[in-house]
Amino acid sequence: GSDLVSGFWGKVDAHKIGGEALARLLVVYPWTQRYFTTFGNLGSADAICHNAKVLAHGEKVLAAIGEGLKHPENLKAHYAKLSEYHSNKLHVDPANFRLLGNVFITVLARHFQHEFTPELQHALEAHFCAVGDALAKAYH
């Protein structure tokens, strides 16, 4: 599973995929916008999809998820600071981590239609789920 994801991950453009995924999250699940009030205009799907702060943060998030691939045995420790930050400072509902993982899967499937096998989807979902669990650690 993780070898499959690692091999695939090198093809993923964090800027394009990450930005699109975070923008999609904010459009599809509008209540998540409350965590991004400092990001400027989130008034429409078009505004969100062209918002430079949204796109940059999406890239940052996807890059951080990719970094987790280097620490598969120790995700909770790897993401401990981010978990604390999202829990204590941002008060992000941890259910949103799963939503974002689902949106990433959707966007990756859209961009990599021919390579997006059920096996790859399974491996990606396992990784996103593990990252979400690690990020939710500070909530327990």
From Swiss-Prot:
<dbReference type="Pfam" id="PF00042">
    <property type="entry name" value="Globin"/>
</dbReference>
<dbReference type="GO" id="GO:0043177">
    <property type="term" value="F:organic acid binding"/>
</dbReference>
<dbReference type="InterPro" id="IPR012292">
    <property type="entry name" value="Globin/Proto"/>
</dbReference>
<dbReference type="InterPro" id="IPR000971">
    <property type="entry name" value="Globin"/>
</dbReference>
<dbReference type="GO" id="GO:0031838">
    <property type="term" value="C:haptoglobin-hemoglobin complex"/>
</dbReference>
<feature type="binding site" description="distal binding residue">
    <location>
        <position position="57"/>
    </location>
    <ligand>
        <name>heme b</name>
    </ligand>
</feature>
<dbReference type="GO" id="GO:0020037">
    <property type="term" value="F:heme binding"/>
</dbReference>
<dbReference type="GO" id="GO:0005344">
    <property type="term" value="F:oxygen carrier activity"/>
</dbReference>
<dbReference type="InterPro" id="IPR050056">
    <property type="entry name" value="Hemoglobin_oxygen_transport"/>
</dbReference>
<feature type="domain" description="Globin">
    <location>
        <begin position="1"/>
        <end position="140"/>
    </location>
</feature>
<comment type="subunit">
    <text>Heterotetramer of two alpha chains and two beta chains.</text>
</comment>
<protein>
    <recommendedName>
        <fullName>Hemoglobin subunit beta</fullName>
    </recommendedName>
</protein>
<keyword id="KW-0479">Metal-binding</keyword>
<dbReference type="GO" id="GO:0072562">
    <property type="term" value="C:blood microparticle"/>
</dbReference>
<dbReference type="GO" id="GO:0005833">
    <property type="term" value="C:hemoglobin complex"/>
</dbReference>
<comment type="similarity">
    <text>Belongs to the globin family.</text>
</comment>
<keyword id="KW-0349">Heme</keyword>
<feature type="binding site" description="proximal binding residue">
    <location>
        <position position="86"/>
    </location>
    <ligand>
        <name>heme b</name>
    </ligand>
</feature>
<keyword id="KW-0408">Iron</keyword>
<dbReference type="InterPro" id="IPR009050">
    <property type="entry name" value="Globin-like_sf"/>
</dbReference>
<dbReference type="InterPro" id="IPR002337">
    <property type="entry name" value="Hemoglobin_b"/>
</dbReference>
<dbReference type="GO" id="GO:0042744">
    <property type="term" value="P:hydrogen peroxide catabolic process"/>
</dbReference>
<keyword id="KW-0561">Oxygen transport</keyword>
<keyword id="KW-0813">Transport</keyword>
<dbReference type="GO" id="GO:0046872">
    <property type="term" value="F:metal ion binding"/>
</dbReference>
<dbReference type="GO" id="GO:0019825">
    <property type="term" value="F:oxygen binding"/>
</dbReference>
<comment type="function">
    <text>Involved in oxygen transport from the lung to the various peripheral tissues.</text>
</comment>
<dbReference type="GO" id="GO:0004601">
    <property type="term" value="F:peroxidase activity"/>
</dbReference>
<dbReference type="GO" id="GO:0031720">
    <property type="term" value="F:haptoglobin binding"/>
</dbReference>
